[in-house]
């Protein structure tokens, strides 16, 4: 019966397994079921020792970072910036066309000096239109610069990620064969 007694240490699961194995050989069916139940309970209680942290263990392999998403975002931002530039050019062209119309209004006012009130109304409406266009133009230019700033930031982040990616790949040690 000496084999049934064993000094239990903190993580000595082998000793417990040995005792249970020796005792299990002489069990009846009911005792075997009880033994299995007790064994499972013991297995839950005993935690295996933590694995030793040694520098000899191979480092984990890192997957390279997928930068295609960032490329797509940069492409979209760049396209938005180009679209804003074309909108700015279009509004400038509209402005020039309106200035040409102003000249036509002046020539008409010279011919029709009797309708002074109508000319002043037309001029005030035209000024309001120009003011609105200036506001829109200013906003579009501001949006364009914001997109350009965002594009530069994303490009900077992309460069940093590429650097980090290359560092991670260079730090991965080959798996011991």
Swiss-Prot record:
Regions of biased composition (Basic residues) lie at 131-146
List, as start-end ranges, the regions of compositional bias called Low complexity: 78-93, 120-130
Q: Where is this region: Disordered?
A: 78-146
Indicate what this protein is called per its UniProt record. Answer: Putative uncharacterized protein DDB_G0287893
